[in-house]
């Protein structure tokens, strides 16, 4: 189906290569057609998929970037886990139901010894409402817990008096210097006193 005979992965890689050397401002100004596909002829020669969403995500990532401890030569890893958080997705004549998926995202860097040098963790809870009449409603946008910041509303319920993003930051700081094997052995019952002093949310 591709006019340039390339698969999605190849085109996504081509777009990533095209961005190398650009500033965040230049990325944000990349022009696209109404369908999100690029206008630039050079980019079109290797990428014809819609790139507007990826463009905006890259620009946003640049705007949110901060120094967390990574160094030149570190390896970057991304982990994503999705779990069904819906108890029942059968709507009845008198009851609407919500279908929710909990998506956990962790990005980290590790040095040549495999020890974490920086990490950031986030979570999103996108949900659909299945109406009793069979229609399905979805929010226009879903904000992650980090994006919600203080408005997430966890501080009052936290034994540490912390908001969710602060718990996440505490957990990520705790990971620094640890290997994957050491992290995998972390107790899930909150019995690690050092971690419990920083973070009491579920980190499993």
Region annotations inferred by a language model:
Residues 1-204:
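Active-site- and interface-proximal helix/loop "cap" or "latch" segments in soluble metabolic
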